[in-house]
Amino acid sequence: MMKITILTVGKLGRMVEAQLALDYASRATASGRALALGPVDILEVEARKPGKAAEAEVLRPHLEGAYVVACDEHGKAWKSRAFADHLARLRDDGNRRVVFLIGGADGLDPSILAAANETMAFGVQTWPHALARAMLAEQIYRAATILSGSPYHRD
């Protein structure tokens, strides 16, 4: 099994975006089980001081031993099928943990970006981090359905 964690800066509480992200993470866990993908978890962290450097300090302990994908506006934008294939390759290459990072309002600290194995973007636009986590969870769910042959994804 390849555990997938969406690691985010900031807590959404009961916001509708948080519920949407949790719903898609749950669906991804259920759909990915037979594919050795998951569980898919969302972990929220908060820094005690403001700023990207302080956020980096609370993110860093969660990265050890993981394949790290930083969500950043300058990262690679994946088409859904290619993203599904990429997740399958990460699993097949023996990665036991993949951590997707979503920074706070100012993005991720350069030291975290440098430590990441890769960066990915949700297109050329900038998205609020609350929406980004829901979009990422949905894409992980979509990837699991693509890999399982489910009709959820349509080209």
From Swiss-Prot:
Catalytic activity: pseudouridine(1915) in 23S rRNA + S-adenosyl-L-methionine = N(3)-methylpseudouridine(1915) in 23S rRNA + S-adenosyl-L-homocysteine + H(+)
Entry similarity comment: Belongs to the RNA methyltransferase RlmH family.
Highest rank taxon of the organism: Bacteria
Function: Specifically methylates the pseudouridine at position 1915 (m3Psi1915) in 23S rRNA.
Presence of the UniProt keyword Transport in the record: no
Residues that, per the record, bind S-adenosyl-L-methionine: 103
Compartmental location: Cytoplasm
A single GO cellular-component term on record: cytoplasm
Enzyme class: transferase
Protein name: Ribosomal RNA large subunit methyltransferase H
Gene that this sequence comes from: rlmH
Subunit field text: Homodimer.
PANTHER family, A to Z: METHYLTRANSFERASE (PTHR33603), RIBOSOMAL RNA LARGE SUBUNIT METHYLTRANSFERASE H (PTHR33603:SF1)
One Pfam family, short name: SPOUT_MTase
GO function terms (MF aspect): rRNA (pseudouridine-N3-)-methyltransferase activity
The keyword Transferase is assigned to this record: yes
Keywords, alphabetical: Cytoplasm, Methyltransferase, rRNA processing, S-adenosyl-L-methionine, Transferase
EC number: 2.1.1.177
Leader peptide range in chain numbering: none
